[in-house]
Amino acid sequence: MNPNYIILFFLVVAVIVLFYFVGSSVSLWIQALVSGARVGLLNIVFMRFRKVPPKLIVESKIMATKAGLDISSDELESHYLAGGNVSRVVQALIAADKAKIELSFNRSAAIDLAGRDVLEAVQMSVNPKVIETPMIAAMAKDGIQLKAISRVTVRANIDRLVGGAGEETILARVGEGIVTTIGSADSHKHVLENPDLISKRVLEKGLDSGTAFEILSIDIADVDVGKNIGAELETDRAEADKKIAQAKAEERRAMAYAREQEMKAQVEEMRAKVVEAEAKIPLAMANAFEKGNLGIMDYYRMKNIMADTQMRDTIGSPDRETPREK
């Protein structure tokens, strides 16, 4: 094979590869050149080898240059390689510059890498955001439940976006303040008559400390009367006391019944002793006759007394029927 053809083949392949890498980069280089953004052609070419999208970097560089910001392409590349959103950061810097808010590229990149939306934060610094809390229920000292909904106007604090708490913390603190204010009120009517009292006391607590926001105002949107929790608690307590009293009464009744049965058993026991003693009387009389301690007249006198006693018992018995009833 002719060596010239081999050389020609390699030259064609080299031209194709060069055109692939340089062709698209030339258009971006010309675009940056006419826009006043200084980005070297070789720098654009080697961005592909660094796995950096040249189009994104060049367009972001042009955007910053047109806005009067001096940001190097190396800073944009490093932020992209760190996993940041380059276009979002540049847009945030432009918005901050127009709003006269001091924000450096490093600060903006740090906010973006921290997971915050830096552009939204800048916009919230210019146009405060209104956050509506869910319905919060609390009970005043008179036992009446109140349900309140508030609207919190917040502004992003650029200096505390990194490491500062988010909206959830603001909502939780505002809810805690509302519950505390309502709970400290002597009467629910006082809160209904002065709903701004809640806003004033909550604002005095400095709830935005340690957060990424600055609370501008807290407005009570709605206050409704809920349940009479105090009355419900008293009812439940009375019902519990009633059940306790019933249990104690049942216990006393059971003890009284047991005592009654015990006394009946004792009565029967005493009757048995009486019967036993009566059964011994004939034996005692026989012994008295043998020893001469009891005479025949004494015996008959005792029998007469016993007969009279039995007759009186029979006459006085309520179960005895009269002759007319028969």
Swiss-Prot record:
Membrane topology: Multi-pass membrane protein
Keyword presence, Amino-acid biosynthesis: no
Transmembrane segments: 6-26, 27-47
Main location, first listed in the record: membrane
Keywords for the protein's UniProt record, in alphabetical order: Cell membrane, Membrane, Transmembrane, Transmembrane helix
SS bond partners: none
InterPro entries on file: FloA
Keyword Membrane: yes
Annotated GO CC locations: membrane raft; plasma membrane
Domain of life: Bacteria
Subcellular location: Cell membrane; Membrane raft
Pfam families: FloA
Family from the record: Belongs to the flotillin-like FloA family.
Function (record text): Found in functional membrane microdomains (FMM) that may be equivalent to eukaryotic membrane rafts. FMMs are highly dynamic and increase in number as cells age. Flotillins are thought to be important factors in membrane fluidity.
Subunit text: Homooligomerizes.
Protein name: Flotillin-like protein FloA
